């Protein structure tokens, strides 16, 4: 397979850094653009001595200038956890709008392919279960989650507009809940939050009854699916996630057992617009990409808990 020069925005984040590692190991050259608003320098430090890796510190809402040819532009930059996009609501909207416009403009100027990292949040609090790519969603545009949900929905619309009117070769991946090593303990996502509370002998905080469900995909499976989408010719959105569903209450119990810790659970009021269920229909990924997750959830959880135990909290 031909070696590509890839520009990856948000490459210092959790997903972006795993994808950078994967692409470098495949023999591609990767230029990461990140402003560290939520990404971390330590996530990309392991690549600093790799001749195929380049880093540019920049806000992608500003014009992006890259010297030389580019084969693929991957737009992963965005605050993605509730804590982050509630803290940076304007930046979240700007990176979804201006950041997507600038990265699409780069792809257009370089005659490069383009992939947008979208999200299951475009489905909002779904009234259809599981969610397939034809479902338009159930989103409150002015609710607290709206800044992220609508930023990604706009980014998808802009991507398809560039595909149709500028003939840009585009891809859209709708990423469902993903977990694994290198997650920030303070990013507000449920798995690192529960692990941190458990390892610190703090009570585990469950919002609502804990009967609400999520589906969690291990990060190596996600990256593998994204790469298959990159190499495909499919331009419509594709769900990538693990359809294995688990309640938040069961998740807390599993983390306690995995960490060999006694747990105390504290219930708090459910946040506004928090979805009751989230589960991907991955029929398209199976049929178009021949992709399905390989890592069993409990195995991935064990690897993640052990990583957190090996790194200071």
Give the residues covered by each predicted segment:
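N-terminal Rossmann-like NAD(P)+-binding domain of SDR-like oxidoreductases, especially those catalyzing
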Residues: 1-178, 220, 295, 303, ...
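Residue-level signature of the cytosolic catalytic core of signaling kinases
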Residues: 49, 143, 183-187, 244, ...
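Short alpha-helix within the catalytic core of nucleotide-sugar-dependent glycosyltransferases
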Residues: 37, 42, 191-192, 223, ...
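A glycine/serine/threonine-rich, flexible loop-to-helix segment
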Residues: 129, 185-193
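C-terminal substrate-binding subdomain of Rossmann-fold SDR/epimerase-dehydratase oxidoreductases
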Residues: 6, 19, 58, 102, ...
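A short beta-to-alpha transition loop/helix N-cap that caps and shapes the active-site region
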Residues: 39-41, 124-125, 182, 248, ...
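Conserved alpha-helical elements of sugar-nucleotide-dependent glycosyltransferases
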Residues: 15, 190, 247
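Hydrophobic alpha-helix immediately C-terminal to the catalytic Tyr-X-X-X-Lys motif of short-chain
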Residues: 154, 158, 162, 194, ...
